[in-house]
From Swiss-Prot:
Heme binds at H263, H323. This is Heme A synthase. The gene is ctaA. InterPro entries: COX15/CtaA_fam (IPR003780), HemeA_Synthase_type2 (IPR023754). GO terms for molecular function: metal ion binding; oxidoreductase activity, acting on NAD(P)H, heme protein as acceptor. Interacts with CtaB. Its main location: membrane. Catalyzes the conversion of heme O to heme A by two successive hydroxylations of the methyl group at C8. The first hydroxylation forms heme I, the second hydroxylation results in an unstable dihydroxymethyl group, which spontaneously dehydrates, resulting in the formyl group of heme A. The lineage of its organism: Bacteria, Pseudomonadati, Pseudomonadota, Alphaproteobacteria, Hyphomicrobiales. Its EC number is 1.17.99.9. It comes from Bradyrhizobium diazoefficiens (strain JCM 10833 / BCRC 13528 / IAM 13628 / NBRC 14792 / USDA 110).
Length: 360
């Protein structure tokens, strides 16, 4: 049987496919952010995987959708008297968010099946791609679980479920970014072990900050305490105000003041850690890791400025979405920096021998 050696970049097509999916996920997160900021997330009160792909196409269908929305607490307590045209405005945001989610599922699954049929994927890569697909399916379920939390007793979705939904989306995104980088041969960067540790720590703190940011969003905490650097009249609020709920740990997730304070403090920690990592990388002459650290520090700095401006201006949609977009950029750079400094031994990059006479 005649065979040919795999090309120098055996996974070039796979990489571009995954890059496209990652870009779609980033767009999905931003559309989700706009859906939340416009209070549109509860405008569709049911989940229909297939038939839900089509919006209302007649006046009767629009009336039916609007009447269903009128039955939930959000309409009765916040939007009573809303017109049909106003309902359509919030409906389109949520419908677009769900449609994009379906499109991402198709954009991932169909090429994945093709690459499986074509062959040439390593066992490790196939396991990773199946895991990402499973997480994508879980994300769809988590999205409906989140929406369901606001349909019976609340006028908004649970901040816990919102944070879970966002973090899972960006965990999938980060997994794809890591996988894309692992699919291309790169020389191992000679750098001190402490740089590998601080890059990984930066990635962990970035995820923690994203989670806290989602809690802030879910509690509408960005519309309170709109001063900086003071919060509630002081640099550090009083313990009585921070910890008045019982049990004490609930304040970390439910107390608007405490959650915003946590988000601020974590932002400061992330800024300092990024600065120290960049200084150490440059001083250590770590090559590409030094430039990567500087880019990461620049993104964290920009994110801090945007966060302050968003707070001081009481969360205008444009600034809030810019803040969310730069958060995705910070996460991307943190993943790239961690992968750059990690061990380069990877099963995904092993060349394969592909038979000419058959697909795989």
């Amino acid at each position: 049987m005649t065979t040919i050696s795999a090309p120098s970049e055996p996974y070039r097509a796979v990489r571009w496919w995954l890059i496209s999916v990652a870009a779609l996920i980033a767009l999905m997160v931003l559309v989700g952010g706009a859906t939340r900021l416009t209070e549109s997330g509860l405008s569709i009160v049911e989940w229909k995987l297939v038939t839900g792909s089509l919006p209302p196409l007649s006046a009767a269908q629009w009336t039916e959708a609007f009447e269903a929305y009128k039955k939930i607490p959000q309409y009765r307590e916040l939007n009573a008297g809303m017109s049909l045209s106003e309902f359509k405005e919030i409906f389109w945001w949520e419908w677009s968010h769900r449609l994009l989610g379906r499109f991402i599922g198709v954009a991932y699954l169909l090429p994945f099946l093709f690459f499986l049929w074509r062959g040439g994927l390593s066992r490790e890569l196939k396991r990773r791609l199946w895991l990402l697909f499973a997480l994508g399916g879980l994300q769809g379920a988590v999205g409906w679980w989140m929406v369901a939390s606001g349909l019976s007793e609340r006028v908004e979705v649970s901040q816990y479920r919102l944070a879970t939904h966002l973090v899972l989306a960006l965990l999938i995104f980060a997994g794809i970014v890591w996988t894309v980088r692992r699919l291309k041969e790169r020389a191992q960067i000679a750098a001190p072990a402490r740089l590998r540790f601080t890059s990984a720590l930066l990635l962990v703190v970035t995820f923690v900050q994203i989670y806290l940011g989602a809690l802030v969003a879910g509690l509408r905490a960005g519309r309170a305490y709109n001063t900086w650097p003071e919060i509630d009249g002081a640099l550090i609020p009083s313990a009585e105000r921070l910890w008045f709920e019982t049990p004490w740990w609930r304040n970390m997730f439910d107390n608007v003041l405490t959650v915003q304070f946590e988000h601020r403090m974590t932002a400061y920690a992330l800024f300092v850690l990024a600065a120290l990592h960049a200084f150490d990388a440059v001083r250590s002459r770590a090559g590409l890791a030094a430039s990567g650290a500087l880019w990461l520090f620049a993104a964290v700095s920009l994110q801090a400025v945007l966060g302050i401006l968003t707070l001081l201006n009481q969360v205008p949609i444009g600034l809030a979405l810019a803040h969310q977009a730069v958060a995705i950029a910070v996460l991307t750079l943190a993943v790239m920096q961690t992968e750059r400094l990690a061990s380069r031994q990877s099963a995904e990059t092993q060349p394969r021998v592909v038979p000419v006479s058959q697909p795989g």
